[in-house]
């Protein structure tokens, strides 16, 4: 059965969250571990693929094959300075196949596999989709997915591709701070007054500032700014560097940076210390046998942490100044400053923002981890025709974060759509040829705020040919930019004299996936899903055999039962059970069918003996005390008896 609505997904750098409109309100959905946010981690092992909590929990044991931060790669080029800098902090391998698109290399089931950032992100989206399906009890086909407001065209398009690969129809890509503003607006209710609201959204990997006016149900974005590469991960990096040096100083120059496992354990401890410092003034890190069998203990206070990250914290104020400037608004006119994103819990960040607004009390009424998914779920409800008094008349007027234009003579950036223009929008402009009898024009589309295109970001190029011979400046070429509600651009050019026309959806060939690649990845995703299902079935069959064998063993250990069995039967049962457990121990990677066959073999020996004993006691069909029901042995194994099955690892 298919869910006729749509879900809202906040696809985060470090954590993701999913919500749905149910019972006239948004429900934020907990995952299979009971957590309302899911780590944006994907891990590959010799036998399976893990996503979310399961992936993050084993990262110290398997650092090279556990992928995170895909959002910091998506829509970027391999040679991007930001990517090159991040690679120093990642234990997994990022390479390129020569087309400047980054790919991630991992070992999966004994083979080397490469995945694009879109593919990894699609796996996280799939996990969120499955989380929603488990809650709704229906298949989910549609979603609204959020992106940082300052994401460029190729990053937005790549995120949309990730949704397609995961099997979702992405109804809309919306900006994270705008989604959070919806959550704030619904939470506050309509008091009939127009309010100027600044959303300060500092998450795990990205930072956005959006200034908007809320009047009744109309949310009108005035300006947006930010940094697509600033967040909690960067604060963690500073702590990791600090403690790596501390370890070196305390241990005669031992460099733990040479061990990915040690670095990962340290990073986990640093993330925990960072969180502690939001509520306490001091945090202690204790890690046994961190590197070269040396234990590590160190303390850091809040003041030192603030000093280590001071420049990063201070850099969050500049985008705030810029949005006020772009919106031509005085900071005293801002009614509410709303904090969103986990990193806004840091006291220093809060005090910097409050001081900038003259000591203003900051609004912390919405959950900083869930607000974005909440807003996305509201938008998903509206886009699928949902009706509710709360969402009646709700209208989102968002803006494009960056100026869009084309290159004209001399490498000049000629703007067609200025930054902070409300979307959707369409703008046209007439251009002409640069030389006499020019047969065609090469149109290059750029995004950015600089005067020259060499300092802006190239989105894509196309040609318009077949222009009749004419002196320079005579042909009239109309270039039209059509920016949709997702912030994705379509460009067309038409020669007015002949009506010759050409157009492209900006696909940024250098950073974007082709239709064929997306289709191939959709098919791959189905295959991986089938693999995951097969692995789950295999584990269930293995557990079924293990549970049955141990339950029989426990039953034989019960004096009520063993006293009523003759020695031959008892010996047969013991021998068969021990043989089955020994087989299990040596065949951890057997197939589902082999486990089921082994269980059937064991049942064929055990059941007749137990039935015979039971009948000799005159028992009916109802079972007896001390003898378990063997009809559905696939749950958790009863206590008693060691096992070579799954072990619980302590997470560093």
Curated annotation (Swiss-Prot):
Region Disordered, residue ranges: 619-652
Swiss-Prot/TrEMBL keywords: ATP-binding, Nucleotide-binding, Stress response
This protein's record includes keyword DNA-binding: no
Keyword hit for ATP-binding: yes
Xref: Pfam families: HSP70 (PF00012)
Molecular function terms, GO-annotated: ATP binding; ATP-dependent protein folding chaperone
Origin superkingdom: Eukaryota
Amino acid composition bias (Low complexity), ranges on this chain: 626-646
Matching CDD domains: ASKHA_NBD_HSP70_HSPA1
Gene3D superfamilies on file: 1.20.1270.10, 3.30.30.30, 3.30.420.40, Actin, Chain A, domain 4, Substrate Binding Domain Of DNAk, Chain A, domain 1
Family as reported in the entry's similarity comment: Belongs to the heat shock protein 70 family.
NCBIfam families, per the entry: PRK00290.1
Full protein name: Heat shock 70 kDa protein
Gene name as annotated: HSP70
């Amino acid at each position: 059965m298919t869910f006729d609505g749509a879900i809202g997904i906040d696809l985060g750098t470090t954590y993701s969250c999913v919500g749905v409109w149910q019972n006239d309100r948004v429900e934020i959905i907990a995952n299979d571990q009971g957590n309302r946010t899911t780590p944006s981690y994907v891990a590959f092992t010799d036998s399976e693929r893990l996503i979310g909590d399961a992936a993050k929990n084993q990262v110290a044991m398997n650092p090279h094959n556990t992928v995170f931060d895909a959002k910091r790669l998506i829509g970027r080029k391999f040679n991007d300075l930001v990517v090159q800098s991040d690679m120093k902090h990642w234990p997994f391998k990022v390479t390129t196949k020569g087309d400047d698109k980054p790919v991630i290399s991992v070992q999966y089931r004994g083979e080397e596999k490469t995945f694009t950032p879109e593919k990894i992100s699609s796996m996280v989206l799939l996990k969120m989709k499955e989380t929603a399906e488990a809650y709704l009890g229906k298949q989910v086909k549609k979603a609204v997915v959020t992106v940082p407001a300052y994401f460029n065209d190729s990053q937005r398009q790549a995120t949309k591709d990730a949704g397609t690969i995961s099997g979702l129809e992405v109804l809309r890509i919306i900006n994270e701070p705008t989604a959070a503003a919806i959550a704030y607006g619904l939470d506050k209710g309509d008091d009939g007054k127009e309010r100027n609201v600044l959303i300060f959204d500092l998450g795990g990997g990205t930072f956005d500032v959006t200034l908007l006016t809320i009047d009744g149900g109309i949310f009108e974005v005035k300006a947006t700014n930010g940094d697509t590469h600033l967040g909690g991960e960067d604060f963690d990096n500073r702590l990791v560097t600090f403690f790596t040096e501390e370890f070196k100083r305390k241990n005669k120059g031992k460099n733990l940076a040479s061990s990915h496992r040690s670095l990962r354990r340290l990073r986990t401890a640093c993330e925990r210390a960072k969180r502690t410092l939001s509520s306490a003034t001091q945090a202690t890190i204790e890690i046994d046998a961190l590197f070269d069998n040396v234990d590590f203990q160190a303390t850091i206070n809040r003041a030192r942490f603030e000093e280590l990250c001071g420049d990063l914290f201070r850099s969050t104020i500049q985008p705030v100044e810029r949005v006020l400037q772009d919106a031509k608004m005085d900071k005293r006119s801002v009614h509410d400053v709303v904090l969103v994103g986990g990193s806004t819990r840091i006291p220093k960040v809060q005090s910097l923002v409050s001081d900038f607004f003259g000591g203003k009390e900051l609004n912390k009424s919405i959950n900083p981890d869930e607000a974005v998914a909440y807003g996305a779920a509201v938008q998903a409800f509206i886009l699928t025709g949902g009706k509710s008094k709360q969402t009646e008349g709700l209208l989102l007027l968002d803006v494009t974060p960056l100026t869009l234009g084309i290159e004209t003579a001399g490498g000049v950036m000629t703007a067609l759509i200025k930054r902070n223009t409300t979307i959707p929008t369409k703008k046209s402009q007439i251009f002409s040829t640069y030389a006499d009898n020019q047969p065609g024009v090469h149109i290059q589309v750029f995004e950015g705020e600089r005067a020259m295109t060499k300092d802006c970001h190239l989105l894509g190029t196309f040609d318009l040919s077949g222009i009749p011979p004419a002196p320079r400046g005579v042909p009239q070429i109309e270039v039209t930019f059509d920016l949709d509600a997702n912030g994705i651009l379509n460009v067309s050019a038409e020669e007015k004299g002949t009506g010759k026309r050409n157009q492209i959806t900006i696909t940024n060939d250098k950073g974007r996936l082709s239709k064929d690649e997306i289709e191939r990845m959709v098919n791959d995703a189905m295959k991986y899903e089938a693999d995951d299902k097969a692995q789950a079935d295999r584990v269930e069959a293995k557990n079924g055999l293990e549970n049955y064998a141990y339950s029989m063993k426990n039953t034989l250990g019960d004096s009520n039962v063993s006293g009523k069995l003759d020695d031959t039967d008892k010996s047969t049962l013991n021998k068969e059970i021990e043989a089955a457990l020994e087989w299990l121990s040596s065949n951890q990677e057997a197939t589902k069918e082999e486990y089921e066959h082994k269980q059937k073999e064991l049942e064929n020996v055990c059941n007749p003996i137990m039935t015979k004993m039971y009948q000799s006691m005159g028992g009916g069909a109802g079972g007896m005390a001390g003898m378990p029901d063997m009809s559905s042995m696939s749950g958790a194994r009863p206590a008693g008896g060691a096992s070579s099955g799954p072990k619980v690892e302590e997470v560093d």
